């Protein structure tokens, strides 16, 4: 067990962060002005039967407005605006309509409340995201789920116990996903439509192995029979390939494995590189599944490389020469950007690389060390963890405003966040 811990700590962006003092302040860089946002009035039309129902409907209206504003493209208001979203409440039904300036109101869709705040909040998140997409053609991001590993702070054991949890972007509806009494890390959504499946690494068998689970199951199942430690899974639904790191042959190497949610692993894992490429880690697929980014220390310090793997494999090439101590690359859903971590002036910061221009940009500046950036569906927002060796919190980061804000959850170390499980935002035409 001790050897597994040493190996895990030698990999990038896992349990060991550089020492730092945690400061949970917002970042103040190039804030987008309100005048560049699209104003949208949100009006609740209701005749509640009592004050409790009135208060509940008003809270849902406010939640809907916050959801619309989350993407940093819309400015919801109770004042007059060129466009208005009407929420007509005929409890338990809510009817959403859109009125544009100089035109009549048109029904968009309706939903039925259950009276369960958790279910109703999710329904409002999904409604807001669908309307956000309708107005901006950019996906809304309030309806996704953030999964992460939660460990007790100041654990005295050498190998901490950490279960997986899910939470909404606003810190609400914190929900336990696993109850395995072990250490679970690096959860990753599989991004398969209508199936909230995710992979993660667990130590419940004594050594780190990759497991598969869904939101409604308390324990996952091991998916690979291969020997050795297994780390950092990532899945491409386009090519049905699983990429991961394993020390089966002695060195932490990058492997790919054909995988189906229905049948499991198909064939045997393929090692992509040899030991001449050093220790490898943190793979991430392009949206089309034909390329990977990953980290290698073959030149002495961890740097990020990009490699085509389909339809034929090409040699890796260095992604950026600007930073020499980088980790945790993750490809944006639109395929245009790669977010990553890099040590800048002694602090691990979040950066982003633009594939079209070849330019990279530092997004954060605060003094706590950051790790594990994960994209929202709009490719404009990230979730990441930040802290020190024994404290860690989750933060949301906007590439539009360049501001971060803490997700207030409670005590414990929150690490390895992954944002996903975004429902379809297609709106069917109504008569």
Curated annotation (Swiss-Prot):
Give coiled-coil spans as residue ranges.
none
Cellular component GO terms, alphabetical: periplasmic space
Tell whether Lipid biosynthesis is among the UniProt keywords.
no
Predominant location: periplasm
Q: Where is the signal peptide?
A: 1-24
Q: Which domain of life is it from?
A: Bacteria
Where is this protein localized, as stated in its record?
Periplasm
* Keywords of this entry: Periplasm, Signal
What's a Pfam family this protein contains? PD40
Q: Signal as a keyword? A: yes
Q: Which PANTHER family match?
A: PROTEIN TOLB (PTHR36842:SF1), PROTEIN TOLB HOMOLOG (PTHR36842)
Family label: Belongs to the TolB family.
Q: What is this protein called?
A: Protein TolB homolog
What is the organism of origin for this protein?
Chlamydia trachomatis serovar D (strain ATCC VR-885 / DSM 19411 / UW-3/Cx)
Q: What is the lineage of its organism?
A: Bacteria, Pseudomonadati, Chlamydiota, Chlamydiia, Chlamydiales
């Amino acid at each position: 067990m001790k050897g597994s811990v040493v190996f895990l700590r030698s990999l990038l962006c896992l349990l060991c962060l550089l020492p730092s003092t945690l400061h949970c302040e917002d970042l103040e860089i190039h804030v987008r002005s309100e005048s560049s946002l699209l104003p949208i009035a949100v009006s609740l039309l209701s005749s509640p039967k009592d004050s409790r129902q009135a208060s509940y409907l008003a809270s849902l209206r406010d939640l809907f407005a916050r959801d619309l504003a989350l993407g940093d493209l819309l400015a919801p208001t109770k004042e007059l605006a060129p466009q208005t979203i009407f929420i007509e409440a005929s409890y338990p039904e809510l009817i959403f309509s859109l009125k544009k300036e100089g035109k009549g109101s048109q029904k968009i869709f309706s939903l039925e409340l259950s009276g369960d705040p958790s279910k109703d909040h999710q329904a409002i998140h999904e409604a807001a995201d669908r309307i956000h997409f309708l107005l901006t053609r950019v996906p809304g991001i309030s309806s996704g789920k953030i999964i992460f590993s939660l460990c007790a702070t100041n654990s005295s054991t050498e190998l901490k116990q950490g279960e997986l949890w899910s939470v909404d972007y606003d810190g609400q509806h914190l929900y336990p996903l696993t109850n395995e009494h072990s250490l679970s890390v690096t959860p990753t959504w599989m991004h398969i439509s209508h199936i909230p499946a995710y992979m993660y690494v667990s130590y419940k068998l004594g050594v780190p192995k990759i497991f598969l689970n869904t939101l409604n199951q308390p324990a996952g199942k091991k998916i690979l029979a291969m020997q050795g430690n297994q780390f950092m899974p990532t899945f491409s639904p386009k090519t049905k390939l699983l990429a991961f790191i394993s020390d089966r042959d002695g060195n932490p190497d990058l492997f790919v494995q054909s995988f189906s949610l229905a049948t499991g692993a198909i064939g045997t894992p393929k090692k992509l590189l040899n030991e001449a490429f050093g220790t490898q880690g943190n793979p991430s697929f392009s949206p089309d599944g034909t390329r990977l980014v990953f980290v290698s220390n073959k030149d002495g310090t961890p740097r990020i490389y990009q490699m085509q793997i389909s339809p034929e494999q090409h040699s890796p090439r260095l992604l950026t020469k600007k930073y020499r101590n980088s980790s945790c690359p993750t490809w944006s859903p639109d395929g245009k950007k790669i977010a990553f971590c890099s040590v800048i002036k002694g602090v691990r910061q979040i950066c982003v690389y633009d594939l079209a221009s070849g330019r990279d940009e530092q997004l954060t500046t605060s003094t706590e060390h950051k790790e594990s950036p994960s994209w929202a569906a709009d490719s404009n927002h990230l979730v990441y963890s930040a802290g020190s060796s024994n404290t860690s919190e989750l933060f949301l980061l906007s590439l539009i405003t360049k501001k971060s804000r803490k997700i207030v959850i409670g005590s414990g170390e929150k690490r390895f966040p992954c944002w996903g499980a975004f429902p379809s935002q297609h709106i069917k035409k109504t008569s």
